[in-house]
């Protein structure tokens, strides 16, 4: 069905409003679809307080064997073809593309459909039609789907871990942390939905009954990244549908397999067809169709700055038949810095920078891309950082002993190596790495790279590299270090290592990032512990994993009745 042929239907939000306004049995009744109070003794009301899922340490031999078996099982399914899922129906596209193991670029893990613009439109229209019924489902019931999905995810945990080891090149612990974060999002957002569903407090006045409650938006397009392909995908998607919206989910073409595993979980818990629709393919071929469709109400995106800004621009253009201002929730990366003060534990600082710079090959928006070191300890810190980096094992991460795996694809590898070349041409001093790893195998492996004597305005001091490269910048003193830290267009994460309370407090006031860490690394945010999102070109400061996050997928409605 073309855009011009779309059924008029009820506009987004109207179905729920109709339900609210035509089912009143009293002045404060009739909003069961979003804010019905759970029945006493129901499963949702008996939920324990939220607690983060613990990551495996894989010291137990039985657990290691189970993980190796899970990896073998995923490898045994390599080459399988997967369909689009639209309205619960499995649909073919216009040909297929493969998702590959970056540790072994000859291994095709799965074949995925290339969705066409027409299929993208069909997915939006299906989600739009489903919204009328899904938006009427009580909040408690919607939250229960998240809790059930979390339980299935726990049961399939090693399978999900193994998929990310093979598809994204995560080491075992990084992969398991990704799965744990996905479980955390499900458990936390389910509880948050129950909280938002309760009556909201208002000031009372004589002669009126007043209420304020939240209703969903409509159809959302969810575009997650490949680097946290389960955690961020699950967080973005579950937040959108637990609030009563329907979703078109378009995973990255570098991580469709783990996204498809999540769809299997949603099918297993019997989430109604059409609530989440799964389309794969090139963002260039279907992205504009999804974002620009007049029935798209919001876009939730995590990815690069340039793609994010393109989404913001397209979403701002009103399409024929569009009756709302589209909402965009965007996280777009960072150029994150760790400041190393003259008065600090340099051994701890070197370990923290190594982990934050090179964990998951530096392919985190929160990664330490810059180490800004006060002059007095600059040379000593460099010596310690190089020594720490020399301990890193590089190789295929299906083997537990390898800590640093491959970068995601050839395009990423070429880009990272180009940045390393530019860094040296602009005056940087190569201290470690700087080239592909010769011993690692048939994958996209780059040695962990340290470039010293970088200037703040150098290319590698400003641009996000998204690879295992740490630019080290010398600062005259602590004040200069904070100035340098703020001297980029980004503002996502940052850290300060210092023994001086006054300097930590200065950083608290002046280091302009959404997530600031003191005397620890700048990576590793936990749900409901470190609400995550950044300033400036890092995005809309959406604070995933926070008690504000679900509001981004809701709109408030006030109703007053004279009595």
Residue ranges and their predicted role:
Residues 2, 12-15, 23, 28-37:
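Short, low-complexity intrinsically disordered segments enriched in A/P/G/S/L with frequent Arg
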Residues 19, 265, 270, 292, ...:
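ALDH superfamily catalytic-core signature
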Residues 19-20, 38-44, 104-110, 129, ...:
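Conserved C-terminal structural/oligomerization subdomain of aldehyde/semialdehyde dehydrogenase
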Residues 29, 34-109, 435:
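Hydrophobic face of amphipathic alpha-helices that form TPR/SEL1-like repeat modules
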Residues 75-111, 116-122, 126, 151, ...:
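Non-catalytic terminal/interface segments that mediate subunit docking, oligomerization
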Residues 100, 104-197:
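Glycine-rich loop-to-alpha-helix module at the N-terminal edge of alpha/beta enzyme cores
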Residues 106, 142, 164, 186, ...:
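Residue-level signal for inorganic ion chemistry
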Residues 165, 193-348, 475, 541:
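Rossmann-like NAD(P) dinucleotide-binding subdomain of oxidoreductase/dehydrogenase enzymes
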């Amino acid at each position: 069905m073309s855009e011009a042929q779309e059924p008029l239907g009820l506009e987004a939000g109207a179905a729920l409003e109709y339900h609210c306004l035509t089912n009143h049995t009293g002045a404060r009744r009739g909003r069961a679809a979003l804010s019905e109070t759970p029945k006493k003794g129901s499963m949702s009301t008996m939920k324990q307080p939220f607690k983060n899922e613990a990551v495996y340490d894989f010291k137990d031999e039985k657990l290691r064997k189970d993980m190796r078996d899970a990896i073998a099982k995923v490898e045994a399914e390599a080459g399988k073809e997967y369909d689009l899922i639209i309205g619960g129906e499995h649909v073919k596209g216009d040909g297929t593309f493969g998702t590959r193991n970056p540790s072994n670029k000859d291994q095709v893990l799965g074949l995925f459909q290339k969705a066409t613009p027409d299929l993208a439109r069909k997915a939006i229209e299906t989600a739009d039609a489903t919204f009328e019924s899904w938006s009427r489902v009580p909040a408690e019931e919607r939250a229960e789907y998240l809790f059930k999905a979390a339980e299935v995810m726990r049961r399939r945990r090693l399978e999900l871990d193994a998929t990310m080891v093979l598809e994204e090149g995560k080491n075992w612990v990084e992969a398991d942390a990704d799965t744990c974060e996905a479980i955390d999002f499900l458990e936390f957002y389910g509880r948050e939905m129950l909280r938002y569903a309760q009556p909201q407090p208002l000031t009372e006045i004589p002669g009126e009954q007043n209420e304020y409650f939240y209703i969903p938006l409509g159809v959302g397009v969810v575009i997650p990244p490949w680097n946290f392909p389960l955690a961020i995908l699950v967080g973005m998607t579950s937040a959108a549908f637990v609030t009563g919206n329907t979703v078109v989910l378009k995973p990255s073409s570098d991580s469709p397999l783990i996204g498809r595993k999540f769809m299997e979980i949603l099918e297993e818990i019997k989430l109604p067809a059409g609530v989440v629709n799964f389309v794969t393919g090139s963002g260039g071929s279907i992205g504009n169709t999804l974002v620009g469709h007049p029935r798209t109400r919001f876009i939730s995106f995590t990815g690069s700055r340039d793609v994010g800004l393109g989404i913001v621009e397209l979403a701002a253009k009103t399409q024929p038949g569009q009756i709302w201002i589209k909402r965009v929730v965007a996280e777009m990366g960072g150029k994150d810095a760790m400041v190393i003060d003259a008065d600090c534990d340099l051994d701890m600082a070197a370990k923290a920078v190594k982990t934050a710079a090179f964990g998951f090959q530096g392919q985190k928006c929160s990664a330490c891309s810059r180490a800004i070191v006060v002059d007095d300890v600059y040379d000593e810190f460099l010596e310690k950082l190089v020594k720490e980096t020399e301990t890193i094992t590089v190789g295929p991460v299906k083997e537990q002993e390898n800590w640093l795996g491959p970068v995601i694809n050839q395009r990423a590898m070429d880009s990272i190596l180009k940045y390393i070349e530019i860094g040296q041409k602009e005056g940087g001093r190569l201290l470690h790495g700087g080239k592909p790893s010769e011993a690692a195998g048939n994958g996209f492996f780059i040695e962990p790279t340290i470039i010293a004597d970088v200037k703040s305005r150098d290319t590698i001091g400003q641009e996000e590299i998204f690879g295992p490269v740490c630019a080290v910048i010398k600062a005259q003193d602590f004040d200069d270090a904070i100035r340098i830290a703020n001297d980029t267009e980004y503002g996502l994460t940052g850290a300060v290592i210092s023994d001086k309370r006054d300097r930590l407090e200065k950083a608290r006031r002046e280091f302009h990032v959404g997530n600031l860490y003191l005397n620890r690394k700048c990576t590793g945010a936990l749900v409901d512990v470190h609400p995550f999102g950044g300033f400036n070109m890092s995005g809309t400061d959406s604070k995933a994993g926070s008690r504000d996050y679900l509001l981004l997928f809701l709109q408030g409605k006030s109703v007053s009745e004279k009595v």
